[in-house]
Amino acid sequence: MHSRNRRQFLAGLPAIGLIAAHATEDQPLEHIIFGSCLDTHEHPMLDRTLTLPRDLFVFMGDNIYADKGGIPMMQEKYALLKSSRFFQGLKNKPILATWDDHDFGQNDGGADCPIKKEAQVEFWNWLDEPADSPRRKQEGVYHAQSFGPAGKRVQVILLDTRCFRSPMKKVTKDKAMLGGTSVPTDDESTTILGAEQWNWLKNVLKEPANLRIVVSSIQFAPEAHGGECWANFPHEKRRMLSLLQGHTAIVLSGDRHWCEFSRDGVFDFTSSSMTQKHPRGTPTTNKHRIVPKTYHLPNVGHLHIDWAASAIAVNVIGEDGEAKIEQRVSFTKLQIR
């Protein structure tokens, strides 16, 4: 097997290490809890999360904040998270994770991050990935895991939006938007995922699944807000939508420290932050927002799969355990056309 094809194959192997715990092909997934932006390990929202119905938990990035202290701080923060009551309470069910900039090692970082290789080692150490795991040998933390039997199979695809990402196009501060100075580029030689990860994704999408959940640390649907999002690389966004054509899929994203539900070719449900409230309390402009309400206090997302009705319900859950944003979507509407 060609070395590139072999790496693509290995990245799609069934999970091993901690993230394999309790995974089964026989039991269909019904309840997925997901969250991002975890800056403390003791918080009422984390306690509430452990009480929610859960077949799988997904960390969507910024799982620690260690972009200013190098590898020693990263090791310390991962150790604190790993020993926390919250993380220990999650381990009775499968856990999946990807990273964003603050656990990658550089704020808004991309391919030029000087400690990305060392950060990847610490990421897999946190998840107890075995020393001989194929995932430790590839560049980037992208991977996929399938759950459930034929007819009720869910494929969770965790993207790495950091390791290969080209520098973002920036404007001066006097031209900044509410969310920052990042703007779309027209340079189609730039990338978010990189050639290797794109090739891997193409192959992973050939695997059988009734529902595909694509986890992106940054938002996919929203655009023109000045912060990090797929719309800053419009050719990459178009490429993703093209690859997803014909699939029943939803994107889960984090990063923004608020929650919203958007659609631009594919549904994008953003849940952020698990432990922080947004200081401004108002979102940036998003013409693709399909639910007017947004939520800016600590939260997690809950995706419930109703197999009998061929539909999903996605909710933002607050500290009180109540749903703050709710939306039900049929599998038919989730099909990318």
Give the residues covered by each predicted segment:
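N-terminal secretory signal peptides
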Residues: 1-4, 11-18
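Metal-dependent phosphoester/phosphodiester hydrolase catalytic core
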Residues: 6, 16, 22-337
